[in-house]
Amino acid sequence: MIPDPRDVILRPVVSEKSYGLLDENVYTFIVHPDANKTQIKLAVQQIFSVRVLRVNTINRQGKRKRTKHGWGHRSATKRALVSLAPGDTIEIFGGPGA
């Protein structure tokens, strides 16, 4: 159980693909790996005061990367694609609604 909504939503994803989804009112976040869709929905609604229609999640495996001393590994992440109700926007992204 993750009690605080700010422990569920870790940070927004800043990428070309996430900015492209802003036109469809879909926002992308890195979330806690143990969070489920219901917890993510409630956290976004509490933090940003918006209505969430749908939450899709993606578990991304960490990439293996070469370092000076051998092979390293990036950590795995969980992403949430959050669809908002028409008319609701989140201003932190600086997208079409901002």
From Swiss-Prot:
Family as reported in the entry's similarity comment: Belongs to the universal ribosomal protein uL23 family.
Role played: One of the early assembly proteins it binds 23S rRNA. One of the proteins that surrounds the polypeptide exit tunnel on the outside of the ribosome. Forms the main docking site for trigger factor binding to the ribosome.
Positions of disulphide bridges: none
Protein name: Large ribosomal subunit protein uL23
UniProt keyword terms in alphabetical order: Ribonucleoprotein, Ribosomal protein, RNA-binding, rRNA-binding
Pfam families attached to this UniProt entry: Ribosomal_L23
A molecular-function term among this protein's GO annotations: structural constituent of ribosome
Stretches assigned to coiled coil: none
Domain of life where this protein originates: Bacteria
GO BP field: translation
